[in-house]
Amino acid sequence: DKLDAFLSDNEEKTLLYFADTTQPVLPRLEAFLEKWGIAVEPSSVIETDNRKIINSNPYFSTTQIENTELTDTMTDISIPLTMPFARPLDTVFETNMDISTSVLLQSSETTSVIPYESESDLENWTPEEYGPFSLAILSKKSFEDGKTSQIVAYGSSVSLSDSLLSSGSFSNADYYLSVFNTLTHRENVIAIQSKTLGGQELGLNTAQVFLIGLSFMIAVP
């Protein structure tokens, strides 16, 4: 398996996975993720508390940071983070031989799940299970020399949309830049200056700065 080979060559590799509620069943990929302790559930996360819903859309709500391991270079953690139209994730195990998992992001306690492949009418839908549900999971494989390879799985591909990355109302761009800075061990980190502070502008919008960080990460093993 090419993904196994990529992550098992003892060179500190990282794989990022973003789930989507419109994607087809991917049995081989999902089986691979489960070997790393990550399960992708066939449902969508939906918020039941109107106070936490964004733009009157129950699939669009705020997200809680559960683990700060990848958020060290965020400039402002008070700005809300969102994982819209997300599939819930689950940890298959916490530790299995040389692989360990940890939850990075969670939905609120008032979220529920609805099968994403159904034509269910929300007006007739009744929640059967409540959160929090995992929305991001980090899985690490440790080698004898102390190096690690890792998978970071996210339940929402929409969280990377241009509108969210360029929005000053959400910290998605700040969060993902911190993730990439941390995973690539950057000493001179890329950061997004808060819009509430003065200072000289660089002539790049948030999405463009994010793409610089993304390109750098892809180029580094």
PLM region spans:
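Short, aromatic-rich amphipathic segments at membrane interfaces
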Residues: S159, L164-S166, I190-L214
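Acidic, S/T/G-rich, low-cysteine, solvent-exposed domains in lumenal/extracellular/periplasmic regions
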Residues: D1-N188
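Noncatalytic linker/hinge segments flanking ATPase motor cores
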Residues: N55-T63, A191-E201, P221
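Selective detector of the "anchor" transmembrane alpha-helix that sits immediately C-terminal
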Residues: S8, V209-P221
